[in-house]
Amino acid sequence: MDSPSSIATGSLRIEQSVTNQIIRQAALTVPGCVEKAAGVRSVLGKTLPQADITTDGPYIAAEVHIAVSWPAPVAQVARSVREVVRSHLEAYMDAQVTEVSVFVDTITT
């Protein structure tokens, strides 16, 4: 049996699309945050929620764009999305989250 010091180590790379999916699924767990094609994103075939991610080693910063259903409290939904996204990134990616900015791109009725 190999001792821990003799086992070869490797690298781990998680594709940005996986990180985006984690963020998307996290955001959609928040009541009032809904899936929606909006603006230019709809022309590109992208739906909200959507994330733009910046990584630097173990550090992640995310901009999350969401749609909120009317009459949900917009500010509370955005705060909850920020908290849930941070929690999911830390739990599922073992990442050190430096920032999560949430942008409400549209309200649905």
Label for each model-derived stretch:
Residues 1-75, 79, 91, 95-109:
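Contiguous, often N-terminal, cationic amphipathic patches that form binding interfaces
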